[in-house]
Amino acid sequence: YLVNPAAYAALGAYMFLLILIGFPINFLTLYVTLEHKKLRTPLNYILLNLAVANLFMVLGGFTTTMYTSMHGYFVLGRLGCNLEAFFATLGGEIALWSLVVLAIERWIVVCKPISNFRFTEDHAIMGLAFTWVMALACAVPPLVGWSRYIPEGMQCSCGVDYYTRAEGFNNESFVIYMFIVHFLIPLSVIFFCYGRLLCAVKEAPAAQQESETTQRAEKEVSRMVVIMVIGFLVCWLPYASVAWWIFCNQGSDFGPIFMTLPSFFAKSAAIYNPMIYICMNKQFRHCMI
């Protein structure tokens, strides 16, 4: 054991809790949306996409991590490590790029930079395809030799190799690519869209043709998406910051817990998105009941 066995027991229990909440809540989101026609709006396709990404994380990643934390090290070998890290990365990236698509959708609908634009089913499907392409562009390279997935922290879960400059893997270039293309750029787009959105909401009453109910509905959706973004940042920023610090200070000393805590905190992302969605979407709650 790298650390006190009790820490592994706590980790296992935490993962069990995440599976216990994460699976039903994401499955419910999927099921209710597919069951009720009126919920099948283009915007909800993206939220469905988030639920699918979370299920990937729960089934592909969390189950593996719970199993390995019972053993105190990563027992599933190279293949298991690759699979677990792939699903965790894919899920996290689909969530991030889905938030980008939602942010762009909010910006276009509320700020109307393109007049007479309607967010249709085709746009939603293009948005979905885009999130998957971008997520795969981040999760696949370590499987095919550009960087690699290795056990991290307490060695119960795997992630991208920020730790070493291993020969032949080009870790540095991948980590820099990942941070810029799959973290900074999406966040910049999200912040740009919400910056414009806040300005538009302030200027809105002066130039409004739409009914009050439409406005209220748009505001509610915007509020929900903003809270999802804040939730994403709360979950993923500590992990990204620690990973970047380790990458910049390779060879310096840090304990296994240092990387484990933010990494496992980030995993809670699979629960909060559907919770926000269920808590803030009246129509969804009615259909659920």
Swiss-Prot record:
It comes from the Eukaryota. A motif ('Ionic lock' involved in activated form stabilization) lies at residues 105-107. The record marks 84 as: Plays an important role in the conformation switch to the active conformation. InterPro entries: GPCR_opsins, GPCR_Rhodpsn, GPCR_Rhodpsn_7TM, Opsin, Retinal_BS, Rhodopsin. The modification N6-(retinylidene)lysine is found at residue 267. The keyword Magnesium does not apply. GO terms for biological process: absorption of visible light; G protein-coupled opsin signaling pathway; visual perception. PANTHER family: OPSIN. This is Rhodopsin. The gene is rho.
